């Protein structure tokens, strides 16, 4: 039943955020997070027990080459201020792709901030 109440948040990250996130995979349950494989040129390699997390293909020659997917409960997306603070904290170092309502909420938040300070 939990699976039916989950929504996938997908974003792509710049290298600095990818490196930060790959070190802190304990934030979400292991069956609810998927992260990009490392750059082949990167000397860092995941330890064997964490290989299952690194299942998404890196997008070569892209400004945001590291896709990340996190399955979260619907209520987290709608009401959890900590989740939104966490996502917004990455600022221009991530590009949120889905769900669309989160993309729109982030656009509105940054538009409101821009109006406030300009």
Regions found by a protein language model. Name each.
Residues 1-118:
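Polybasic (Lys/Arg-rich)
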């Amino acid at each position: 039943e939990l699976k039916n109440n989950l929504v996938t948040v997908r974003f792509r990250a710049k290298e600095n955020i990818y490196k930060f996130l790959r070190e802190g995979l304990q934030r979400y349950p292991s069956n609810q997070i998927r992260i990009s494989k490392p750059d082949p040129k990167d000397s860092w390699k995941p330890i064997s027990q964490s290989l299952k997390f690194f299942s998404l293909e890196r997008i070569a020659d892209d400004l945001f080459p590291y896709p990340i997917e996190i399955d979260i409960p619907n209520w987290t997306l709608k009401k959890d201020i900590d989740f939104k603070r966490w996502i917004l904290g990455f600022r221009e170092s991530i590009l949120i792709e889905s769900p669309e309502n989160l993309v729109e909420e982030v656009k509105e938040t940054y538009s409101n901030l821009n109006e406030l300070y300009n």
